[in-house]
């Protein structure tokens, strides 16, 4: 049975983890959200989130975006390549409803799977 938990080892926790991804990322994005990814040697994917107050003013909106992103990652974790991902929210992401945000994330995860197979 496949575990769909979201333990600590699936998260990017330190600034050095984020810097590693920002150095040579593979990008997949929409006008509202970008996912940067870089292959890791851990054998499983990890995720980090950046939702700036500058782009999403209200705390409850930032929390909603992070919650939906984590849930999308948690459900797809076994299909994703062994990469470190950083999800960057841009202006306008707060205007998306939950369904539109989830669909955008699914599309970006699929694109990263294709990018990983191609490299």
Swiss-Prot record:
Reactions that this protein is recorded to catalyse: Endonucleolytic cleavage of RNA, removing 5'-extranucleotides from tRNA precursor
Short name of any one Pfam family annotated for the protein: Ribonuclease_P
PROSITE patterns: RIBONUCLEASE_P
GO biological process, one term: tRNA 5'-leader removal
EC number: 3.1.26.5
UniProtKB keywords: Endonuclease, Hydrolase, Nuclease, RNA-binding, tRNA processing
Domain of life assignment: Bacteria
Gene Ontology CC entries for this record: ribonuclease P complex
GO molecular function: 3'-tRNA processing endoribonuclease activity; ribonuclease P activity; tRNA binding
InterPro entries: Ribosomal_Su5_D2-typ_SF, Ribsml_uS5_D2-typ_fold_subgr, RNase_P, RNase_P_CS
UniProt subunit comment: Consists of a catalytic RNA component (M1 or rnpB) and a protein subunit.
Family listed: Belongs to the RnpA family.
Function: RNaseP catalyzes the removal of the 5'-leader sequence from pre-tRNA to produce the mature 5'-terminus. It can also cleave other RNA substrates such as 4.5S RNA. The protein component plays an auxiliary but essential role in vivo by binding to the 5'-leader sequence and broadening the substrate specificity of the ribozyme.
PANTHER family per UniProt: RIBONUCLEASE P PROTEIN COMPONENT
Name used for this protein in its record: Ribonuclease P protein component
Gene name linked to the record: rnpA
């Amino acid at each position: 049975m496949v575990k769909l938990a979201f333990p600590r080892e699936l998260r990017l926790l330190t600034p050095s983890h984020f810097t590693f991804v920002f150095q040579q990322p593979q990008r997949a994005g929409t006008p509202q959200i970008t996912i940067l990814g870089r292959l890791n040697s851990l054998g499983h994917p990890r995720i980090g989130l950046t939702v700036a107050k500058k782009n999403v003013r209200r705390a409850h909106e930032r929390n909603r975006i992070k919650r939906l992103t984590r849930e999308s990652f948690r459900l797809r974790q076994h299909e994703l390549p062994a990469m470190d991902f950083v999800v960057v929210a841009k202006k306008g992401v707060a205007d998306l409803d939950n369904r539109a945000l989830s669909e955008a994330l699914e599309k970006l995860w699929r694109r990263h799977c294709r990018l990983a197979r191609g490299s």
